Amino acid sequence: VNITESIDVHTQSNWITGKAKNMVIRRNANSITVQGSLPKYQYGNNLQTLQRADTGLIIEELSDLIRTDLSKARLQRVDFSTNIITEHKPQYYYRFLGHLTRFYRHSDNSSLYYNQGCKKLLFYDKIKDAKAKQMLIPKQYQNKNVLRYEMRLLKQVKKFFKRDVLANDLINKQLYNY
C-alpha cells in the first residue's frame, strides 16, 4: 500500500491517500472515499464477472486493510456490467438496439451510449477495449466476440434505488433484481 498525505487547498482538509492494487482510498477527519473496480481488484481485469460472495470478501479485505468497517459505507457511484459472447462483432448488434425514452443515444465506431444525466448505458467491444488497455484476456474470452453491457449510476444512487445503497447491499441478490 502506497500512502501519501496532502492538504486540500479549497477546504484546508488534511487527506491521507493510499492505493491497494487498483483501489484508491482517501481519508480525512470526516469521510473515507474508496474508488476503483472490484473485479480489477480481485482478478486484475474487469472481463471476469465478480460473484456476490467475492464482493463481500473484497469489502471485508478492504475493511481490514484500512481498519474501518466499509460494509455500511454509502455508495455514491455504482457500475453494473456483464459480458455477452456473440457470433458477430459487437458493433453488428448496435443497429438492433433502438432508441430509449428520455435517453440520448450516441454511437461511434466501436461503442453505443445511452445518456441520461447521471445514468449511462454502454455497449461496446470488450476485447477491443481490453487490448487497447493492455489487459490480460482470460482464456474463456480469447478469440471470442464479447459484447460488454454496462449501466453506470454516476451519482444519485439513492434516487435510483429510492434508498441509500450500502456496500454490503452489493452481496444481496435483490439489489440486482431492481
What are these regions (language model features)?
Residues 1-178:
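Structured, helix-rich domain cores that form ligand/interaction pockets
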